[in-house]
C-alpha cells in the first residue's frame, strides 16, 4: 500500500527536494508565496503546485486537496505561516508535521538559529513535531543534536543544520507512514550528531 503526502512551503524547497529524492510520494505542493523556488522543484518532478496568498483560502484549498489526493500526512517544509486552530482540528489527529531548526522547546518561532547563537548555547539541532495550535509547541517526534562551533555564524550553522534536516526529515516521514500501517504513533526519538 502506497502512502501519500502533501507539502506546504514558503521558500527554496530544499527539504521538499530531500523528501522527493527519498522516494516519498508527494501528491501536491502548496505555497503562500508564488515566487517560492521550491515550486520549481515540484514542477520539475511533475508534482501539481498551488499558490494562495491568503491563509484562509489556502487552508480551504488544502483541505480539498487532501481529500482529492487522499493524502495521509501534511508536511510543513519551510512553511512560514501559522495554521489556524480550525484547520488543524479539521484534519485527523497528528496528521500535520513540522520541522524546526532548534531543540524544542528552546527557541520557538522565527530566527531560532540566531536565538541559539545569541544565547550562547553549546548545542542546537532540529526538531520534528506534530502541529498544534501553538507556535512550535506540538508533541515532539524526532530530534537531532548538533554542537555549535566557536566560529559558527548564522550562515554556517544554518548550512550544517540543513544537512541534518535533509537526512532526518525524509527518514521520519517514512517511519510515520510505515507506522500508519501498524496504527502506532512514534514520538520522542532522538539522534545525537555531535
Language-model features: locations:
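One-carbon transfer enzymes
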Residues: 1-194
Amino acid at each position: 500500500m502506497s502512502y501519500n503526502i502533501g507539502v506546504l512551503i514558503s521558500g527554496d524547497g530544499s527539504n521538499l527536494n530531500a523528501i522527493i529524492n527519498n522516494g516519498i510520494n508527494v501528491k501536491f505542493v502548496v505555497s503562500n508565496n508564488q515566487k517560492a523556488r521550491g515550486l520549481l522543484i515540484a514542477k520539475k518532478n511533475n508534482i501539481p503546485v498551488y499558490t494562495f496568498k491568503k491563509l484562509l483560502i489556502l487552508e480551504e484549498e488544502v483541505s480539498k486537496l487532501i481529500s482529492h489526493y487522499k493524502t495521509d500526512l501534511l508536511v510543513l517544509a519551510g512553511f512560514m505561516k501559522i495554521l489556524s486552530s480550525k484547520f488543524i482540528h479539521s484534519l485527523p489527529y497528528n496528521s500535520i508535521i513540522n520541522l524546526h531548526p532548534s531543540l524544542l522547546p528552546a527557541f520557538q518561532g522565527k530566527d531560532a538559529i540566531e536565538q541559539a547563537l545569541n544565547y550562547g548555547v553549546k548545542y542546537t539541532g532540529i526538531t520534528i513535531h506534530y502541529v498544534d495550535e501553538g507556535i512550535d509547541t506540538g508533541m515532539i517526534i524526532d530530534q537531532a543534536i548538533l554542537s555549535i562551533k566557536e566560529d559558527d555564524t548564522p550562515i554556517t550553522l544554518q548550512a550544517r543544520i540543513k544537512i541534518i534536516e535533509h537526512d532526518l526529515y525524509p527518514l521520519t516521514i517514512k517511519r510515520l507512514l510505515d507506522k500508519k500501517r501498524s496504527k502506532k504513533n512514534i514520538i520522542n526519538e532522538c539522534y545525537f550528531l555531535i
